[in-house]
Amino acid sequence: MFHRIEEALEDLKQGKVVIVCDDENRENEGDFIALAEYITPETINFMITHGRGLVCVPITEGYAERLQLEPMVSHNTDSHHTAFTVSIDHVSTTTGISAHERATTIQELLNPASKGTDFNRPGHIFPLIAKEGGVLRRAGHTEAAVDLAKLCGAEPAGVICEIINEDGTMARVPDLIECAKQFDIKMITIEDLIAYRRHHETLVTREVEITLPTDFGTFHAIGYSNSLDTKEHIALVKGDISIGEPVLVRVHSECLTGDVFGSHRCDCGPQLHAALAQIEREGKGVLLYMRQEGRGIGLLNKLRAYKLQEEGFDTVEANEKLGFPADLRDYGIGAQILKDLGLQSLRLLTNNPRKIAGLQGYDLEVVERVPLQMPAKEENKSYLQTKVNKLGHLLNL
């Protein structure tokens, strides 16, 4: 149904149009997208004839500043905060509305010699400012267009047009599939574009390294930041992990209540301590401490989930009642940190098969699963049983 991102990039580089779909829980629509650098009157005419939506030009903040393109409104109340600037026509155009003149305006917008005074305002081309970070920060068509342009090595600007059915309704995925077939156009999703970027781009930065003496032994601690969010992660390294043999690794998600306060609701604290002790005994290994509190939902939402558990919901049902998946964690950032440490082959301390699949999806080889089972407590027996029954954890209870 959907094409690979690589296929879409090849078509875009040839000046072709692609269809990009967003999430069904967001706008749930598809846009025609082309590279602004290769725009032609024929492409504009195709978009307005078969797309029927508004032709917009996603650009970076740099373009907007250079051409003095102010926001369309001072107070943006759009539900998705689409960053429209004032609309423009190039001064060489007449009405500015024809396919030829709209293409001219777009071409001149990209001209490095153009100045703000070279454009009349308002006009018939609608620039949109993409957020820095692209779809990794905002999963919109604006950011998708600029990201695709960058991935093609083109000027960071696109041309987009919403796809509307002949009866005036918004085209949804079944309609978009037929459209793609009719015009032999590649169709991709923003979700796949996000995954592609996460897989192919380096998103972590090694910030600081120290020696950390602990109750379990002395470790080499390395602090990491990442470009996706403000979360900071830490890797505790023991011994020489540069040797080619598989390395014992624990990827541990932060649990303030368990790790720090010794909560009996979970087994996180004992798992953390046992992993550190086991790595120390082996004399070589890595404990990666990820700031993914509450399986990714955050501390306050975890406490809200606990409240629901007190009312009879299990850990999975509580997450879902709060509007979250059972497990919101993504292992891409953790995988990049492990790769930065030079690891390729792992002996993974885990009871969670999803964690194995998550890391292997980023080209890390898990050669062995090393169980990390703690004695159950009266207060967490039900929690652990739910992890077995609903999350597939490998525990002997």
From Swiss-Prot:
<keyword id="KW-0686">Riboflavin biosynthesis</keyword>
<feature type="binding site">
    <location>
        <begin position="26"/>
        <end position="27"/>
    </location>
    <ligand>
        <name>D-ribulose 5-phosphate</name>
    </ligand>
</feature>
<keyword id="KW-0862">Zinc</keyword>
<dbReference type="GO" id="GO:0009231">
    <property type="term" value="P:riboflavin biosynthetic process"/>
</dbReference>
<dbReference type="GO" id="GO:0005829">
    <property type="term" value="C:cytosol"/>
</dbReference>
<dbReference type="GO" id="GO:0008686">
    <property type="term" value="F:3,4-dihydroxy-2-butanone-4-phosphate synthase activity"/>
</dbReference>
<feature type="binding site">
    <location>
        <position position="141"/>
    </location>
    <ligand>
        <name>Mg(2+) 2</name>
    </ligand>
</feature>
<feature type="binding site">
    <location>
        <position position="266"/>
    </location>
    <ligand>
        <name>Zn(2+)</name>
    </ligand>
</feature>
<feature type="binding site">
    <location>
        <begin position="293"/>
        <end position="295"/>
    </location>
    <ligand>
        <name>GTP</name>
    </ligand>
</feature>
<keyword id="KW-0547">Nucleotide-binding</keyword>
<feature type="binding site">
    <location>
        <position position="268"/>
    </location>
    <ligand>
        <name>Zn(2+)</name>
    </ligand>
</feature>
<dbReference type="InterPro" id="IPR016299">
    <property type="entry name" value="Riboflavin_synth_RibBA"/>
</dbReference>
<keyword id="KW-0460">Magnesium</keyword>
<keyword id="KW-0342">GTP-binding</keyword>
<comment type="function">
    <text>Catalyzes the conversion of D-ribulose 5-phosphate to formate and 3,4-dihydroxy-2-butanone 4-phosphate.</text>
</comment>
<feature type="binding site">
    <location>
        <position position="315"/>
    </location>
    <ligand>
        <name>GTP</name>
    </ligand>
</feature>
<dbReference type="InterPro" id="IPR036144">
    <property type="entry name" value="RibA-like_sf"/>
</dbReference>
<feature type="binding site">
    <location>
        <position position="31"/>
    </location>
    <ligand>
        <name>D-ribulose 5-phosphate</name>
    </ligand>
</feature>
<feature type="region of interest" description="GTP cyclohydrolase II">
    <location>
        <begin position="200"/>
        <end position="397"/>
    </location>
</feature>
<comment type="pathway">
    <text>Cofactor biosynthesis; riboflavin biosynthesis; 5-amino-6-(D-ribitylamino)uracil from GTP: step 1/4.</text>
</comment>
<keyword id="KW-0378">Hydrolase</keyword>
<dbReference type="GO" id="GO:0030145">
    <property type="term" value="F:manganese ion binding"/>
</dbReference>
<comment type="pathway">
    <text>Cofactor biosynthesis; riboflavin biosynthesis; 2-hydroxy-3-oxobutyl phosphate from D-ribulose 5-phosphate: step 1/1.</text>
</comment>
<dbReference type="InterPro" id="IPR000926">
    <property type="entry name" value="RibA"/>
</dbReference>
<feature type="binding site">
    <location>
        <begin position="138"/>
        <end position="142"/>
    </location>
    <ligand>
        <name>D-ribulose 5-phosphate</name>
    </ligand>
</feature>
<feature type="binding site">
    <location>
        <position position="350"/>
    </location>
    <ligand>
        <name>GTP</name>
    </ligand>
</feature>
<dbReference type="InterPro" id="IPR032677">
    <property type="entry name" value="GTP_cyclohydro_II"/>
</dbReference>
<comment type="similarity">
    <text>In the N-terminal section; belongs to the DHBP synthase family.</text>
</comment>
<feature type="active site" description="Nucleophile; for GTP cyclohydrolase activity">
    <location>
        <position position="329"/>
    </location>
</feature>
<dbReference type="InterPro" id="IPR000422">
    <property type="entry name" value="DHBP_synthase_RibB"/>
</dbReference>
<dbReference type="GO" id="GO:0000287">
    <property type="term" value="F:magnesium ion binding"/>
</dbReference>
<feature type="active site" description="Proton acceptor; for GTP cyclohydrolase activity">
    <location>
        <position position="327"/>
    </location>
</feature>
<feature type="binding site">
    <location>
        <position position="162"/>
    </location>
    <ligand>
        <name>D-ribulose 5-phosphate</name>
    </ligand>
</feature>
<dbReference type="GO" id="GO:0008270">
    <property type="term" value="F:zinc ion binding"/>
</dbReference>
<protein>
    <recommendedName>
        <fullName>Riboflavin biosynthesis protein RibBA</fullName>
        <ecNumber>4.1.99.12</ecNumber>
        <ecNumber>3.5.4.25</ecNumber>
    </recommendedName>
</protein>
<feature type="site" description="Essential for DHBP synthase activity">
    <location>
        <position position="124"/>
    </location>
</feature>
<dbReference type="GO" id="GO:0003935">
    <property type="term" value="F:GTP cyclohydrolase II activity"/>
</dbReference>
<feature type="binding site">
    <location>
        <begin position="250"/>
        <end position="254"/>
    </location>
    <ligand>
        <name>GTP</name>
    </ligand>
</feature>
<feature type="region of interest" description="DHBP synthase">
    <location>
        <begin position="1"/>
        <end position="199"/>
    </location>
</feature>
<dbReference type="Pfam" id="PF00926">
    <property type="entry name" value="DHBP_synthase"/>
</dbReference>
<dbReference type="GO" id="GO:0005525">
    <property type="term" value="F:GTP binding"/>
</dbReference>
<feature type="binding site">
    <location>
        <position position="271"/>
    </location>
    <ligand>
        <name>GTP</name>
    </ligand>
</feature>
